[in-house]
Amino acid sequence: MNKHGKVIDVMISDRQALIQFEREGDARRAVDREKGQSFRGNRIDVRFASTSDGSFESRSEIPRNRSPRPLPYERDSRDMSPYRDSGRDRSPADRERYYKALRRGDSSKIIEEPENLNNRHGSPDSYRKYDRSRGIVEEPRSRSQLHQDYPVIPKEIQEPKWNSPPFTDKIGTERPGFDAAIIVMSSELLSYAETIESRLQRQIALTTHIIVLKEESHANACVEDLNNKGVLYAFLVNSLNEQHFSCTLRILYGTPQEHRNMPLNNALTFVARNFERYQKHVRDLKTIAPKPTFDPSRMPPGFIAPDDKIIYYLHLLADSRMLTIEELNEVIDFVQKRMQALASAEETMEKAPITGLPNESVQNSMAPKLSIPGNQPVREEKVIQHQTQLHSKILNILKPVPHQSASGVVDNEINNMEQFNTYNDSNISTSKSNNMVINPKVQQALDTLMQSQFRPTAPELSAPAEENSRNFQPVNNPMANPYSMNPTPNMRPINPHSTQQRPMAQGPGGQPFGNSFHGYYQPPIGQPIFRGRPPFQPRPQYPGY
């Protein structure tokens, strides 16, 4: 607007701006030339400000809307009076002219001054704010009567149809009404901050916001608060930056960056390119993350579909792009939720009964195998129960059935029992030779247990002979076992744990049998040597046969 004439004051609100020229002709020329022009892709409407009756008034301003909740380090916005030099602080010369005008009584030259320059509202704050942003303008708390003569703005100007919403840094999250914040360390640097602001608005079309700090130590807290509010850029300016025409640039969105003492021209070029990439990033959020084409009702139970944000992050990871820690945490949380849902669904399917399978083995093979810690105790209990059942079945098989009592049949049964005992002892001795590391006490207990399990008792000798004949085959049958002989009643067993010398049993031709029937019975004098074996033992190979 400076090309149409000298501008005295500019008032900017959310949806309109009021520009006051020094001369009325300049204002009419600006209206004729700027009406219907395009600004940032939108058509603008330029007209004269008027009162409620439609008449033109040279000094026209709009009421200021109250901004959102002020920052914790801000003080009230400095009101922009048309008689003040762009809202800058009073110099001692201005303050002296103010008091001289009061003494002379010339009210036309009185410069508006706040009630208390040092403490405007009674409680000093650590920060002071110089607000000329687009969209965040605060109304003075104690001087609202200064704006009573403002005209009524037409509804067409208050709510133009061409107004566009602000950019969004994240999906569904709106940022404040400015893109860049210019933070100055003292009020003497406001002129340099205004220079940066004008170049940002003219060259890059960024909405800006000027903040004045009272102490430099509050700069980090101010930048952190701006980052939480979603501001894109922050320019930090001190006295040295003004001398060297430089600034400290901080990029707050995405991966934070800081460029200290960067020349202003280079900083503006860098911000222009970065802001263009940011706009492309916002547009890509809608194009790269399409809506899912699958039907959730056809998905398996426990399936969690990713939203647009997660799909976009996954595309970036697939393209080897860099993500921030917050974005990676969102992806990790989604993956963990999906894993938990799938694990719970598989656990439910495992507990449900499975029907229509051919047998138990196929059912066990088709059952899902989960590595969930909660199923481990259940499996251990099943294994222990299965082992207990097998142990009981083995004991039932090996446990002798009570039998009967005819002398010949009893002798055959005793012969079979003793032969089976001899065979088990031989197997125990063989296992002992294979595994040398066996506790002697454990071995003695096993021998005693085997002796007690297979030794016939007195009631067993009184069982009927018919039952014994049905369950046992006589071993003295030459066709069944031609090498066996019935033991005589005067055969006495030898204690296997005694130190008595045991003679080696002899086979046909005087050859020893070996370790299979080593000395469990000592025949009396004149009796033949015992040469029997259990029916299920394989036939030993003797030399000479």
Curated annotation (Swiss-Prot):
InterPro entries: Anticodon-bd_dom_sf, Nuc_rcpt_coact/corep, Nucleotide-bd_a/b_plait_sf, RBD_domain_sf, RRM_dom. It comes from the Eukaryota. GO terms for molecular function: RNA binding. GO terms for biological process: regeneration; stem cell population maintenance. The keyword Transcription applies. GO terms for cellular component: nucleus. Residues 26-46, 72-112, 122-131 have a biased composition (Basic and acidic residues). Disruption phenotype: RNAi-mediated knockdown results in severe impairment of regenerative capacity. The cycling stem cell population is significantly reduced at 8 days post-injection. Isolated stem cells are unable to repopulate an irradiated (and thus stem cell-depleted) host. SUPFAM superfamilies: Class II aaRS ABD-related, RNA-binding domain, RBD. Its main location: nucleus. Residues 26-131, 498-545 are annotated as: Disordered. It is found in: Nucleus. Expressed in somatic stem cells. Also detected in testes where it appears to be expressed mainly in spermatocytes and round spermatids. The keyword RNA-binding applies. Residues 535-545 have a biased composition (Pro residues). Residues 1-51 form the RRM domain. Keywords: Developmental protein, Nucleus, RNA-binding, Transcription, Transcription regulation. Probable nuclear receptor coregulator that can have both coactivator and corepressor functions. Important for maintenance of the adult pluripotent stem cell population. This is Nuclear receptor coactivator 5. It comes from Schmidtea mediterranea (Freshwater planarian flatworm). The lineage of its organism: Eukaryota, Metazoa, Spiralia, Lophotrochozoa, Platyhelminthes.
